[in-house]
Amino acid sequence: NLFGNNSYVYYYQSAFRPPDGWHLHGGAYEVVNVSTEFSNAGTTGCTAGAIYWSKNFSAASVAMTAPQNGMSWSTQEFCTAHCNFTDFVVFVTHCYKSGHGFCPLTGLIPQNYIRISAMKNSSLFYNLTVAVTKYPRFKSLQCVNNMTSVYLNGDLVFTSNETKDVSAAGVHFKAGGPITYKVMREVKALAYFVNGTAQDVILCDGSPTGLLACQYNTGNFSDGFYPFTNSSLVKEKFIVYRESSVNTTLELTNFTFSNVSNATPNTGGVQTIQLYQTITAQSGYYNLNFSFLSSFIYKASDYMYGSYHPRCKFRLETINNGLWFNSLSVSLGYGPIQGGCKQSVFENRATCCYAYSYNGPSLCKGVYRGELTKSFECGLLVFVTKTDGSRIQIRNEPLTLTQHNYNNITLDRCVEYNIYGRVGQGFITNVTNYAINYNYLADGGMAILDTSGAIDIFVVQGEYGLNYYKVNPCEDVNQQFVVSGGKLVGILTSRNETGSQPLENQFYIKIINGTRRSRR
């Protein structure tokens, strides 16, 4: 029934004619999401012979239904409905107009006829023209992934040998709505056939009725108890940490510069200044030790004399104060304090240059044309080549990162867990009120193990003391359905759940209208 928002549809091939009785078969589609739309056309009407409106989906099936009396094939009501299977689009439309701009996809369609077409890469590869006497009004269009089937008013009007999910669908209309969009998932179904026709259908959807019928492959049960298993779909995961916080100290690479004895003076120009102790930093954290500079005198920039570092807003003595770089290279050189730094920067030997005096001899040659043979005081030149960024940090101490761990424990449902490094699946319950002080707890006094080595009970430090939790199997091996009067009326389980009633050493959960009460 496409007109029920909480219902399903069931399709089976016409050649599928099993003997009378219950048969497990695919082809059922269950509604999982419903939305409505009242109009998406302009004031003058909708545009026929074109696809103008679409909604994105990723679904096994999408059904688009009009009100039960349907919509007329008119630009004042319905124009086009389509199913998009990613590689191609199937649509139904009408268009009794001629002239430029009309019927862009189909061309003129005769009056009192509709067109069902399929289009791939803007080219039509399937066309079916049908008289409106067969479909007097538009009532529904359903897109189904199985064989990319399309149903108009419940009739199969298109199919292919491909199976693809529905990626988009839509109805372009002016009035007569609303259009209801029903997104569906594919489920197996147990169908009861008589003379080759399905008379009753039970969905294998995880409901109590579906679990019972599909496990026993029948919908007819005599009174009694029926054990069953239900494989839980685990959707959640949590971690219980040993420590509330973990400190991680990152590696700090240390490099110490030292004075170079017997360094050779340059012989004229900056290109003859020899480089020493070059360090090129990679990604990470570094400490550069320039303590030997304490015996040198820093020379500030004075026109051509001294240091030159306008692109470096720091001194070498403060470079370890958390400065960030994208690339960094540092070298020592010995050259003339007069012009050595400034000309080195101008000739791209470095980004910045720092000059230091040690009252050295005047054995270094000049760096400017006309001064290449003149002698000047030699000094220590520190060359820095850098680009700004965040790959490299220069700092005094190793960086310590603190990760704070929070134990958010998911209770009363089947979850994947990592408890103090032990992983598995389980149904976690809080047993603090019933716990006793155990003498032996594994994993540093935090967990009790069962005979298989899996966690049975674990303890977590809470705000007001210790909290104890028990790990149960996700599936209750003792659970049984209760059938009375030919109907499913309850479940016997070993778990105490919300709304359950104690029954000797088990609990009874009453089932109303095929559904059960939720767990705590």
Swiss-Prot record:
The gene is S. Keywords: Cleavage on pair of basic residues, Fusion of virus membrane with host endosomal membrane, Fusion of virus membrane with host membrane, Glycoprotein, Host membrane, Host-virus interaction, Membrane, Viral attachment to host cell, Viral envelope protein, Viral penetration into host cytoplasm, Virion, Virulence, Virus endocytosis by host, Virus entry into host cell. The keyword Transport does not apply. Belongs to the coronaviruses spike protein family. S1 attaches the virion to the cell membrane by interacting with cell receptors, initiating the infection. It comes from Avian infectious bronchitis virus (strain UK/142/86). Homotrimer; each monomer consists of a S1 and a S2 subunit. The resulting peplomers protrude from the virus surface as spikes. Glycans are attached at residues 5, 33, 56, 84, 121, 127, 146, 161, 195, 220, 230, 247, 254, 259, 289, 408, 430, 496, 513. GO terms for cellular component: host cell endoplasmic reticulum-Golgi intermediate compartment membrane; membrane; viral envelope; virion membrane. This is Spike glycoprotein. GO terms for biological process: endocytosis involved in viral entry into host cell; fusion of virus membrane with host endosome membrane; virion attachment to host cell. The keyword Membrane applies. Coiled coil: none annotated. Specific enzymatic cleavages in vivo yield mature proteins. The precursor is processed into S1 and S2 by host cell furin or furin-like protease to yield the mature S1 and S2 proteins. The cleavage site between S1 and S2 requires the optimal sequence [KR]-X-[KR]-R. Cleavage is not necessary for virus-cell fusion. It holds the Pfam family CoV_S1_C. Residues 1-520 are extracellular.
